[in-house]
Regions:
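N-terminal active-site beta-alpha-beta segment that forms phosphate/nucleotide-binding
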Residues: 1-133
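A residue-level signal for conserved active-site and pocket-lining positions in enzyme catalytic cores
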Residues: 37, 62, 139, 155, ...
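Surface-exposed, charge/polar-rich loops and edge strands
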Residues: 2-6, 110-143, 147-150, 160-209
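Internal, well-ordered alpha-helical segments in soluble enzyme and binding-protein domains
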Residues: 15, 19, 158-159, 198
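Short Gly/Thr/Asp-enriched flexible loops that form oxyanion-binding sites at enzyme active sites
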Residues: 46-53, 148-164
Length: 209
């Protein structure tokens, strides 16, 4: 992580632009109608804001993660203090909302509100009562990746649990999973256990693997 934090901003922007170009050419992206994209942290990972803009401009439905105020069952005091145990993917309606309607959590990550401006509940991708109908594609963040689908997350297991939920809710049509990596994030092998979910595709500035 220390190495990633030292990558200059201009270098992240250059690599991110190449990554986004490759994502836009993926068949799983072209086919997808509902797309979940993580919003990048200030440093150390592929910047996804431009990808989010593309999703909205192309008429696809965009969902981004919300971590706070989502509780599923009992959690330890530390986990409850740090963050809730799970995340939800909530729909962003338009570019205006993406650019100006989000708030930043303590990690410097932008998040959507639970409700829209008119007070109605925001659409949750996995909650049919809010209009959600599942996801076609999930764009994954991480700290390190290998070329075999291995992904090292930030240690809290949010995405592994979320992917498990989507597979249970969408057994006939699980979402495609695409991880985005800077060159500095690619390693020989990422250790993983049974709880870790492998990703279908890894996209780097140099192509898709």
């Amino acid at each position: 992580k220390a190495v990633l934090e030292q990558i200059p901003r201009y270098e992240i922007e250059q690599q991110s632009a190449s990554v986004v170009e490759h994502v836009l050419r993926l068949s799983c992206y072209e086919r997808a109608c509902t797309v979940s994209v993580y919003l990048s942290m200030p440093s150390g990972e592929v910047d996804t804001w431009e990808l989010c803009r593309h999703v909205l401009r192309q008429g696809k439905r965009l969902y981004i993660p919300r971590f706070s105020n989502v509780q599923h069952g009992a959690v330890s005091a530390r986990a409850a203090h740090e963050f809730s145990t799970d995340m939800s993917m909530l729909r962003i309606m338009d570019l205006e909302e993406l650019e100006h309607g989000l708030t930043y959590n303590k990690w410097g990550i932008a998040e959507p509100s639970l409700t829209l401006a008119d007070g109605t509940q925001r659409e949750d991708a996995l909650d049919p009562t809010t209009g959600g109908s599942g996801l076609d594609l999930i764009i994954l963040p991480g700290v390190a990746f290998d070329l075999h689908g291995g992904r090292l997350g930030h240690g809290k297991g949010y995405y592994d649990r979320y992917l498990d939920r989507t597979k249970k809710q969408q057994p006939q049509s699980p979402p495609a999973t695409v991880a985005l990596a800077l060159r500095e994030q690619i390693v020989g092998t990422v250790p993983h256990d049974a709880a870790d979910q492998l990703c279908d595709t890894l996209v780097t500035p140099d192509g898709a693997f």
